[in-house]
């Protein structure tokens, strides 16, 4: 069991159970999965950029990333159906907890002028999406060796039914929300 999962079971579950008056600890919202996505519009013309992004996302996540391909052709973007346009990886269970721990405690504090994560990334059902402008904030990435800084979307999918439940869950886990 990972450090963050221990914190969830021992500290977060009782707090949420008391706050929302749940009868059972099984009703308490939990985290289902974390999805990481890098969208590369220029990758359709530059194959080297795609390979680099795949390697870097695999290193950050600790799990092999897959290429996402265009579903439709769009002439104005010079895009054909089936062309690579990005890469993604979905983390569950132990890798998910390890990644969240790394994100909250190491990566986010390394962001320049970091004042907290804005809480407007909730979708109305308790899931949270966060955009990162530079993937070099992760400890596995050596900032001086990164040629093309890439942004990424991180989506945390929870079993929470409302944004209030989801925000309290992530807040108790240590997500540094903006005050």
UniProtKB/Swiss-Prot annotation:
Which one of the record's GO molecular function terms can you name? tRNA binding
InterPro entries reported in the protein's UniProt record:
Ribosomal_uL5, Ribosomal_uL5_bac-type, Ribosomal_uL5_C, Ribosomal_uL5_CS, Ribosomal_uL5_dom_sf, Ribosomal_uL5_N
Keyword Oxidoreductase set for record:
no
GO biological process terms held by the UniProt record: translation
A single GO cellular-component term on record: ribosome
**Which superkingdom?**
Bacteria
Disulfide pattern:
none
The UniProt entry, under SUPFAM superfamilies, shows: RL5-like
Query: Key word RNA-binding present in the record?
Result: yes
Alphabetically ordered keywords of this record: Ribonucleoprotein, Ribosomal protein, RNA-binding, rRNA-binding, tRNA-binding
Family statement? Belongs to the universal ribosomal protein uL5 family.
| Role summary | This is one of the proteins that bind and probably mediate the attachment of the 5S RNA into the large ribosomal subunit, where it forms part of the central protuberance. In the 70S ribosome it contacts protein S13 of the 30S subunit (bridge B1b), connecting the 2 subunits; this bridge is implicated in subunit movement. Contacts the P site tRNA; the 5S rRNA and some of its associated proteins might help stabilize positioning of ribosome-bound tRNAs.
* Assembly information from the UniProt record: Part of the 50S ribosomal subunit; part of the 5S rRNA/L5/L18/L25 subcomplex. Contacts the 5S rRNA and the P site tRNA. Forms a bridge to the 30S subunit in the 70S ribosome.
Recorded protein name is: Large ribosomal subunit protein uL5
Question: Which organism is the protein's source?
Answer: Nitratidesulfovibrio vulgaris (strain ATCC 29579 / DSM 644 / CCUG 34227 / NCIMB 8303 / VKM B-1760 / Hildenborough) (Desulfovibrio vulgaris)
């Amino acid at each position: 069991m990972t450090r963050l999962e221990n914190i969830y079971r021992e500290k977060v579950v009782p707090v949420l159970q008391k706050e929302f008056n749940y009868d059972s600890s099984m009703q308490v919202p939990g985290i289902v999965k974390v999805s990481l996505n890098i969208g590369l519009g220029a990758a359709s013309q530059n194959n080297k950029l795609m390979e680099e992004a795949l390697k870097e996302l695999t290193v950050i996540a600790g799990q092999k990333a897959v290429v996402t391909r265009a579903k439709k052709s769009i002439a104005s973007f010079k895009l054909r159906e089936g062309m690579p346009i990005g890469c993604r990886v979905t983390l569950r269970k132990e890798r998910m907890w390890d990644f969240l721990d790394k994100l909250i405690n190491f990566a986010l504090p390394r962001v320049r002028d970091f004042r907290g994560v804005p809480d407007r990334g909730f979708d109305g059902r308790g899931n949270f999406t966060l955009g990162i402008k530079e993937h070099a904030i992760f400890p596995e990435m050596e900032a001086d060796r990164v040629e093309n800084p890439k942004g990424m979307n991180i989506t945390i999918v929870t079993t929470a039914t409302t944004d209030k439940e989801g925000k309290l869950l992530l807040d108790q886990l240590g997500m540094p929300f903006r005050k």
